[in-house]
UniProtKB/Swiss-Prot annotation:
Full protein name: Rhomboid-like protein 14, mitochondrial
Taxonomic path: Eukaryota, Viridiplantae, Streptophyta, Embryophyta, Tracheophyta
Membrane topology per record: Multi-pass membrane protein
Annotated signal sequence range: none
Gene name of the record: RBL14
PANTHER family: RHOMBOID PROTEIN 2 (PTHR43066:SF1), RHOMBOID-RELATED PROTEIN (PTHR43066)
EC number(s) recorded for this UniProt protein: 3.4.21.-
Transit peptide (first-last residue): 1-87
Active-site feature positions: 156 (nucleophile), 206 (charge relay system)
Length: 334
């Protein structure tokens, strides 16, 4: 999150760098994490505001995270949507590069459904904790202008929460702006250092993200099994993808019905499958729709085969001479 009174968009030319990094990162992955890609796309589209979504999404002036306005107007739009808005390209690119790395790590290890559930939960928790912190500071210390009336936007509060979750089990050390710290406490070091080097950064928003990550881990540890949000995400995912799965099943079913293509077999039985008959001359499996063997041309009607609905047809000879079989194959495929 960053604090700004007014203004928007300064700096440029960094979005191609973000696009190049995302493409390169996804290209090398055997499995492409879809939720991370969707979050990157959503944040970028909200910032760019292309013509096809510009009339639909609110302007940044309508979604600034401002505790005073949220409480005064009960404006939940500011509470949730402000996380997806950024004031300029450096702000967007820095956050999205961080999301790219953290998102891929977490989604790969957790799975898409659980990762989507976690992100959805952390957005609400980080924004909610920040709101409560601002209100508490107002009531306890009369901090009015400093936090309660500030304007902020950005995904960084959620990223701090994700960092806490990602590093919760780490036992090694990490470098934070050149300072070596235990990885599990890296978010706290980054909170202080970011505030030192980026004065406009929202200290309260980042702190709210860290606390949200800690609360999420505590709740997750005390609850066994899938949480309700994960179950809901999985249910919605199954519902949305049902038409695709249905069509995929139909395509596979049609492929299983062999239409004029078979295989050469050596089994003792002549029954190869539903609607399939095996040529006794060359043991090639043919579609039940064919009256002659596709491999050697032997006619099914002359007793050269088995089918699911009939046994071996009676014939005075079950095998053709080898020379005749070779001749028929040459004629068939020449």
């Amino acid at each position: 999150m960053e604090n700004f009174g007014e203004g928007r968009r300064s700096g440029g030319g960094m979005l191609p760098l973000l696009a190049l990094s995302a493409v390169a990162e996804y290209y090398r992955l055997p499995w492409k994490p879809p939720v991370t890609a969707s979050l990157l796309a959503a944040n970028t589209l909200v910032y760019l505001r292309p013509a096809f979504i510009d009339p639909v999404i609110p302007h940044i002036s309508e979604v600034w995270f401002n505790p005073h306005l949220i409480f005064k107007h009960k404006d939940l739009k500011r509470l949730f949507l402000s996380a997806f808005y950024h004031v300029n390209e450096p702000h967007l690119v820095y956050n999205m590069m961080s999301l790219l790395w953290k998102g891929i790590k977490l989604e790969t290890s957790m799975g898409s459904s659980e990762f989507a559930s976690m992100v959805f939960t952390l957005i609400g928790m980080s924004q909610g904790v920040t709101l409560l912190l601002a209100k508490s500071l107002l009531l306890l210390f009369d901090y009015d202008r400093a936090y309660y009336n500030e304007y902020a936007v950005g995904f960084s509060g959620v990223l701090f929460a994700m960092k806490v979750v990602l590093n919760s089990q780490a036992e090694d050390y990490s470098s934070v702006y050149g300072i070596l710290v235990p990885t599990k406490y890296a978010a706290w070091a980054e909170l202080i250092l970011v505030q030192m080097f980026v004065p406009n950064a929202s200290f309260l928003g980042h702190l709210g993200g860290i606390l949200a990550g800690i609360i999420y881990l505590k709740l997750k540890g005390s609850y066994s099994g899938s949480d309700p949000v994960t179950m809901a995400v999985r249910g919605v995912s199954r519902l949305v993808t049902w038409p695709l799965r249905f069509l995929n099943g139909m395509v596979r079913s049609r492929r299983r019905r062999i239409t004029g293509r078979g295989r050469v077999g050596r089994g003792q039985t002549g029954i190869a499958g539903p609607g399939i008959w095996r040529c006794q001359s060359c043991t090639y499996d043919n579609s039940g729709w064919l009256s002659a063997c596709e491999m050697c041309g032997s006619g099914r009607a002359r007793g050269n085969g088995w089918s699911l609905n009939q046994g071996p047809a009676l014939s005075s000879s079950n095998d053709l001479p080898l020379d005749e079989l070779r001749r028929r194959r040459v004629e068939r495929f020449s």
